[in-house]
């Protein structure tokens, strides 16, 4: 993911920081919980979202395929012994850790080849009361990313029926809510939050 390695150092703009603060509040609101103790962030990037959900008593594991992003992630949380990262492609391999009460993934699922299988893999990592929160684009016309191939994009967002089918096939409940509208290319791109639970 060369694009993300190059973009890593300029990734944390004030706009993105504020956006992820709002996303974190939406997750807590929809999940009906204010705090989480063991968090896994899939496609963590620089930890923009995970960092917003981290408390003094919680741990955060960030996984990503981009070395550049993980470098920034590690620098950002270097003083916190409860935060660590792994360079892992979760579609090709696995991690030993489990029993997370919150698994989050923001704007990463459109980079996956088989999102439905990933839901199943992450379901196995949840604690009994754990939730999986996925944030991504609503189905769009393919214009959101300027160069989808170069940027490793496999899906132009996701339709509501698709998300519901992931839940059904993995025996999970799902709540879906539009939490943002991104304005670019003279268009509006809705962003959803899907909360999966047992």
What are these regions (language model features)?
Residues 117-131:
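A short glycine-rich, Lys/Arg-flanked "PGG" loop and its adjoining helix->strand segment in the class I
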Residues 104:
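A conserved beta-strand element that flanks and buttresses the S-adenosyl-L-methionine
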Residues 42-92:
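Class I SAM-dependent methyltransferase SAM/SAH-binding core
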Residues 194-198:
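C-terminal lobe and adjacent flexible extensions of AdoMet/dcAdoMet transferase-like proteins
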Residues 1-34, 72, 76:
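Conserved class I S-adenosyl-L-methionine
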Residues 14-18, 49, 133-188:
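C-terminal alpha-helical "lid/dimerization" subdomain adjacent to the S-adenosyl-L-methionine
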Residues 107-108:
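Short catalytic micro-motifs in class I SAM-dependent methyltransferases
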């Amino acid at each position: 993911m060369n694009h993300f390695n190059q973009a890593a150092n300029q990734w944390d703009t004030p706009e993105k920081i504020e956006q992820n603060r709002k996303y974190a509040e939406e997750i807590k609101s929809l999940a009906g919980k204010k705090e989480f103790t063991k968090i896994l962030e899939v496609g963590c990037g620089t930890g923009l979202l995970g960092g917003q959900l981290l408390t003094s008593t919680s741990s955060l594991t960030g996984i990503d395929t981009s070395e550049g992003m993980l470098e920034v992630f590690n620098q950002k949380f270097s003083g916190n012994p409860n935060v660590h990262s792994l360079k892992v492609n979760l579609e090709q391999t696995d991690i030993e850790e489990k029993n997370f009460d919150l698994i989050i993934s923001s704007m990463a699922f459109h980079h996956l080849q088989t999102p439905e299988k990933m839901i199943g893999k992450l379901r196995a990592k949840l604690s009994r009361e754990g939730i999986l929160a996925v944030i991504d684009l609503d189905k769009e016309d393919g214009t959101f990313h300027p160069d989808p191939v170069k940027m490793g994009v496999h899906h132009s967002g996701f339709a509501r029926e698709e998300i519901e089918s992931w839940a059904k096939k993995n025996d999970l409940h799902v709540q879906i809510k539009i939490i943002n509208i991104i304005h670019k290319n003279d268009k509006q791109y809705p962003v959803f939050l899907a909360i999966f639970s047992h």
